Every structure is written in structure tokens, then in C-alpha cells.
Amino acid sequence: REKLATFFNCPRPDHVVFTANSTEALNMAICGLLDPGDHVIATDLEHNSVLRPLYRLEAERSVSLSFVPADRQGRIDYGEFERLIRPETRAIICTHASNLTGNAVDIGRVGAIAHAHGLIFLVDASQTAGVLPIDMVAQQIDLLCFTGHKSLMGPQGTGGLCLREGITLRPWKVGGTGVQTYNPAQPEQLPTRLEAGTLNGHGIAGLSAALDYIRTVGMETIREKEEALMRRFYEGVSAIPGVTVYGDFTAPRTAVVALNIRDYDSGEVSDALAQDYGIATRPGAHCAPRMHRALGTERQGAVRFSFGWFNTEAEIDTAIRAVKELAE
């Protein structure tokens, strides 16, 4: 907890709650925060792990929703956040980066808007924790949800929720805590209030070791290498006739590239990359329906390449060659 609190500048380590993944953390935060009649502002960049809890609360608690639209490059207009605020607005929920285009959101700017209007700011850092700087105090983040198995390099089955002091959530599950056994209610103090049941101790130990590794190597060093690999791939494939690349590559971003080859089905392209070249990609809709609609790729989907610290330039060149051959 102390390592994660330091990593994200969460002022209190006991306000770091362990979860199984980002999806659990997001459900915990969204369902524990919102009341009937609340209004929430989110964006077209959101993953289904944000969208589906919101849609469920829209149906079950009459929570109303507004979305900041994305353009054909996956960009958003920050002024739209303020234009969408109503008297009953409770929170702004925003991903730190699109899992499809890789485009990053200026969460410090959004946090300032939220706090200027007395709103709670929830950030989905699934795509960025471990690769882009996150400072809960400086960026005015009230609730931060993250996963351990992506850029934090930890095991699957790890994640968490960091809460600013003063934020209270209804527990979305209750049960054994190992303390206050004779209390019929869930204990009030964090993290116990939100950690019913046995935690993934082995996974948490692995995540702790991963944080040590990131600190030793340096997050900026990791980010620079991943960005260099991503740029090498982007420059190679964007020059290939018949290839369409999605997203804004002039702005801050993560090391993913989503593309299509002509009108080929994205699943078939991904299968060919795996079977013929040994390249693992993610095709389809990426749990990001609003983003695909914004990009006009709802029918075809897209093929997403993700680049990490352990990839090499030779692997990037192989991937470029594979895309070129499939496009011919």
C-alpha cells in the first residue's frame, strides 16, 4: 500500500484498496458513489468497465449521463465538460487514455474543472498506470482506479482503488474482514470497509516486486523506449498503401497503434498476424463501443498493436513487414 500511495501520490496508504482488477475497482467506485438522481459526465473514450456500470445505474437508480464526444481522431473538446455541467451533476468520470487510439487525456485539466464546480473526479488509469505520470494531489483526482497487470507489470488478478480523504463509498460487497468480528455491519475504516474477503496475497506480492522494478529502471526510461517503438511502427505502417491508422499522433499518448488494412475484417487480419508471423494483436471492438462509433469503425473494428518495455526494434520491423505483406 505504501509503495502504491507513493507511486500515485495518494496522501494516505490506508486509502489504497486492493481489488482483482480495474473492472472491480471501477464498479466499487461508481456503484458506491452515485445516488438516485445524480448526473455524471463521462467521455466517448470510456471502456465498458466504466460504461456498463453507468448504464446499469441509469436503469436502476435513474442516474443521468452525458458524454463528451470524440472526433474522428479520438480527440475531445475540454470546454465540453463545463458545458455539460448541471445543478445535479455529481461527478466527472474519465479515462486517462483511450485503450483503442492511445490518445491521452489531460486529467489535470479535467480535475481542475471538476473541483472548480465542486464535483468528484474519478480517473480510470487502466491504460496509463506505470507509464504516464499520475499525481492524485496535483491532478486533483478523488478516485483513481488501476490494474496491476498492464504497465505496472504485475500479475493478473491485481488492481486497486485509491481514494482521496473525505470520499466515502458504500461497500459493494460485505463479509469477512478479520477485524470487528462481532460487528454486524461492515467496519467503517479504510481499507477494511472495501476489502471484504481474502485478498490475492501472492498477486499483491508480485505487484510489489513489479513496483520495485519500475522504480529501479525508471518510469520515464520505460515510457521513452515504448514511445520510440510505437513511433517506429507508426512511421512504418502509415506509409503503406491501404493501411488506415487511427488516433492523433501529435499529442501525448500511450504506446498502442490501432489500424485497419483496406476493408479486411480485423479478426481475420489478427488471425493472420498470429498464425503466419507469430504476432499477437487485439482485433474487434476493444470493449470501447462509443470510441469505435466516433472513429467510424463500428462494423470493421480495428487491429490494435501494443508495445512494451520488453519488445525490440527487430520485432517492430517484423510487424511492419507483416502489415505490408498483408496489405499487398
Q: Which ranges hold each PLM region?
A:
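Pyridoxal 5′-phosphate
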Residues: 1-328
